[in-house]
A protein has these predicted regions:
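A short, glycine/small-residue-rich beta-strand->loop->alpha-helix junction that serves as a flexible
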Residues: 13-22
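Donor-binding and catalytic core of enzymes assembling or modifying cell-surface/extracellular glycoconjugates
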Residues: 17, 206, 210-225
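Short amphipathic alpha-helix
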Residues: 23-30
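Secretory-pathway luminal glycosyltransferase catalytic domains
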Residues: 50-207
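Short beta-strand segments
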Residues: 40-42, 172-173, 220-225
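Short, Lys/Arg-enriched N-terminal segments with co-localized hydrophobic residues
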Residues: 1-3
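A short beta-strand-loop structural module common to alpha/beta enzyme folds
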Residues: 36-47
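Extreme N-terminal starter segment of soluble prokaryotic enzymes
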Residues: 5-10
Length: 225
């Protein structure tokens, strides 16, 4: 199948696995609504020297293809080409980029109008898209996409039966938010910001635990970090 002849969404996945899963599921849902083929850019977000994450969707039985190199903004030329097209995007009648909007606190929200935008034949999607509203219509498809390739290893995990046979609730505690992957010389400010961020998470987590204890019988909490 010649991808050059298709109408494509190229989703630029980034960060850790949870973010990648939302990006993939949401853009898969959008691609089906606007009748485009979804391709995955599994590379350009991970090229920075500051990056400490790695592409992880290859652990799942996802059906979307990896975008070929000519669809990615690789190397120095690709870097500047991406910057230029993004800057000029508002001038295009058919948009070549869709960048998820954030408010001043970097909070995003569901875009009701996304399916009515005029997109170019090949459009690049960048954002976290952290709401199931983008893919709730294809929930069964998404669940199948996220089946593990190595199912045996998954089932043999010591946590599998515990999670599967209880009212399990997973909690992720993000640590070193503003210092991970950075030079120690970046200073005390980032370290303090990380400490504050962790403390705020703990307050939020404790509130969440109390909430779920009222909603479920004997919930079992699994803490990941």
């Amino acid at each position: 199948k010649n991808l050059m002849n298709n109408q494509n969404i190229i989703t630029r996945v980034s960060n850790e696995l949870g973010n990648q899963m939302f990006m993939y599921a949401s853009t898969l849902g959008i691609s089906k609504k606007i009748n485009k083929t979804l391709l995955i850019d599994n590379e350009t977000a991970y090229l920075s020297n500051k990056n400490i994450s790695k592409y992880g969707l290859n652990n799942f039985k996802i059906t979307s293809k990896i975008a070929p190199n000519n669809f990615k903004f690789l190397g120095t030329v690709g870097y500047f080409k991406r910057k230029l097209i993004k800057k000029m995007n508002n001038l295009y009648i058919n948009k070549k980029f869709y960048i998820e909007k954030k408010d001043k606190d970097k909070i995003t929200k569901f875009d009701n109008n996304i399916t009515s935008i005029n997109f170019a034949k090949n459009v690049y999607f960048e954002g976290y898209f952290e709401t199931e509203k983008y893919f709730k219509d294809i929930n069964d498809i998404v669940l199948n996409e996220f089946n593990f390739i190595d199912q045996k290893k998954f089932i043999e995990s010591p946590y599998y039966s515990e999670i599967n046979n209880s009212n399990s609730i997973s909690i992720c505690l993000r640590q070193d938010r503003f210092t991970e992957g950075k030079n120690e010389n970046d200073g005390v400010i980032n370290s303090k910001k990380s400490t504050t961020f962790t403390k705020e998470q703990i307050i939020y987590i404790n509130k969440s635990i109390n909430f779920f204890k009222k909603k479920f019988d004997n919930p079992i909490f699994f803490l990941w970090s």
